[in-house]
């Protein structure tokens, strides 16, 4: 779509910010299409007031109730394949298209469906929103005490970040337990919701919300690290990160593990006792597993990225922006050099905890100085993201994995028959970024689930499945027996 076409659109809200434009470019090039979050909701069977045939309508009504309170769910995007993509206010949303219904007997079957769904581009974004809900029900649930629905939300990353997907599900639970009669009457008439607002309450860009600052020497150093050829940086280690960047995505693979509430709470408690966090423990365990499974040379190491929410740095006078679904996130890179990998390759539990503590200290040093010298500051100099991404095709990647941990998702304060049982957060890293995406989320007092998502052919399936098995074995050991059980002879 050309600038002349989208420039005349009558409902333009604002231009996409630098970070948002990164995701519109990724979508335009087919490099990154959707973020997903699957929530398992339960309701006692005797309280369920709907039959399977009407469940979709019941959920649709609740989704409408959420949408009417969230500007990000009422916008489209124009000019994705240009230098100036923009958000536009939609005049209507057809919920027969946005909320669909399907059968799935298990989380496994939902994950298989999601592998295909994550590769679907968003259709007609100038007239349709960049979100979709697929409601999965268990076909044999009639004889159970609990009716279980799995709500699969997928979103365009320029509109939602991971934290926003969690907010959607908690808002949906609240809407299900506290239905608005006016919304129900509206949905009884037609699945098409007409929108009259202009979305002037749409959240600001993170660059406008947060006062990013930077030192000139830091800027020069970061640009050197990004742009300078490797032969001019002889003291850095060689990175191993799977196959080179390949824009031809043939398939996406998803594997996951689940920890019950007792194990989850035991692991969280132990992390606190060791003065680290679940995020840093997961990064340490990923590094340990990969170091033992990847055939590395003595000069090779890993680099990982950890997602960081920027919402804590939004000023209090802009507080409404903290609760809106939007994009407000960055990441922090951490190196695992050859010396570190050699150590953890032969390490036992004590050494693993030492590294998890060091990662926590490093992360704290970073967040203590934010938003000063934060990578988001550099995005203003990026130019056209499409050119940047295309220039990376076929080149070796730097980062091996990215970790995004949504933490413990609090259930709504208002009580009702609908409850949030678990959440499976799943996104794959952009083609021109990490080879593997590790995503974690838990429900307050409930299960924790960890997904591993990767582009087919970039990493060997056996390698990722081995990492998944290691994480599960070590975390279950920690939760049940009190120790990770990592042996130097593994």
From Swiss-Prot:
Phenotype when the gene is knocked out: Results in enhanced production of cytokinins.
Pathway where this protein functions: Secondary metabolite biosynthesis
Keyword set includes Transferase: yes
InterPro entries from the UniProt entry: Alcohol_O-acetyltransferase, Atf2/Sli1-like, CAT-like_dom_sf
One term of GO molecular function: N-acetyltransferase activity
EC code: 2.3.1.-
Transmembrane residue ranges: none
Expression induction or repression: Expressed during infection of barley and Brachypodium.
Signal sequence range: none
Keywords linked to the UniProt accession: Transferase
Keyword Transferase among UniProt keywords: yes
Protein family (similarity comment): Belongs to the alcohol acetyltransferase FCK4 family.
Biological role: Probable alcohol acetyltransferase; part of the gene cluster that mediates the biosynthesis of cytokinins such as fusatin, fusatinic acids or 8-oxofusatin, known for their growth promoting and anti-senescence activities toward host plants. FCK1 is a bifunctional enzyme that performs the first steps in the biosynthesis of Fusarium cytokinins. It first condenses adenosine monophosphate (AMP) with dimethylallyl diphosphate (DMAPP) to yield isoprenyl adenosine monophosphate. It then catalyzes the removal of the phosphoribose to produce isopentenylaldehyde.
Name of this protein: Probable alcohol acetyltransferase FCK4
Organism: Fusarium pseudograminearum (strain CS3096) (Wheat and barley crown-rot fungus)
Gene: FCK4
């Amino acid at each position: 779509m050309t600038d002349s076409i989208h420039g005349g659109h009558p409902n333009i809200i604002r231009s996409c910010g630098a970070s948002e434009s990164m995701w519109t470019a990724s979508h335009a090039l087919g490099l990154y299409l959707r973020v997903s979050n699957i929530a398992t909701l339960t309701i006692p069977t005797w309280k369920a007031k709907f039959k399977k045939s009407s469940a979709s309508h019941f959920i649709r009504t609740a989704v409408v109730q959420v949408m009417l309170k969230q500007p990000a769910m009422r916008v489209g995007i124009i000019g994705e394949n240009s230098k100036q993509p923009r958000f536009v206010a939609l005049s209507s949303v057809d919920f027969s298209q946005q909320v669909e219904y399907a059968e799935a007997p298990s989380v496994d079957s939902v994950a298989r469906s999601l592998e295909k769904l994550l590769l679907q581009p968003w259709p007609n974004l100038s007239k349709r929103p960049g979100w979709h809900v697929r409601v999965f029900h268990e076909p044999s649930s009639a004889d159970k005490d609990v009716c279980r629905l799995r709500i699969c939300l997928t979103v365009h990353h320029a509109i939602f970040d991971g934290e926003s997907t969690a907010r959607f599900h908690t808002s949906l639970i609240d809407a299900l337990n506290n239905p608005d009669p006016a919304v129900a009457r509206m949905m009884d008439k037609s699945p098409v919701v007409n929108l009259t607002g202009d979305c002037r309450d749409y959240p600001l860009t993170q660059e406008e919300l947060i006062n990013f600052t930077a030192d000139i020497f830091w800027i020069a150093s970061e640009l050197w690290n990004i742009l300078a050829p490797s032969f001019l940086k002889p003291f850095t280690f060689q990175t191993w990160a799977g196959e080179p960047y390949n824009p031809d995505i043939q398939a996406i693979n998803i594997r996951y593990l689940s920890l019950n509430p007792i194990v989850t709470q035991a692991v969280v408690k132990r992390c606190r006792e060791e003065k680290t966090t679940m995020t840093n423990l997961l990064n340490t365990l990923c590094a340990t597993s990969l170091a033992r499974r990847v055939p590395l040379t003595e000069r090779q190491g890993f680099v990982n990225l950890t997602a960081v929410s920027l919402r804590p740095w939004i000023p209090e006078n802009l507080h409404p922006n903290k609760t809106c679904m939007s994009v407000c996130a960055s990441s922090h890179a951490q190196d695992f050099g050859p010396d570190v990998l050699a150590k953890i390759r032969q390490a036992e539990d004590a050494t693993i905890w030492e590294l998890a503590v060091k990662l926590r200290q490093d992360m704290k040093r970073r967040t203590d100085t934010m938003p000063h010298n934060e990578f988001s500051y550099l995005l203003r100099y990026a130019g056209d993201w499409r050119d940047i991404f295309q220039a990376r095709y076929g080149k070796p990647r730097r980062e091996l994995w990215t970790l995004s941990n949504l933490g413990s998702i609090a259930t709504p304060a208002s009580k009702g028959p609908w409850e949030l049982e678990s959440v499976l957060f799943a996104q794959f890293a952009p083609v021109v970024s990490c080879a593997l995406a590790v995503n974690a989320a838990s429900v307050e007092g409930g299960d924790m689930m960890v997904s591993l998502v990767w582009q087919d052919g970039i990493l060997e399936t056996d390698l990722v499945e081995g990492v998944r098995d290691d994480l599960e074995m070590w975390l279950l050991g920690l939760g049940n027996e009190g120790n990770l059980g990592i042996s130097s002879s593994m």
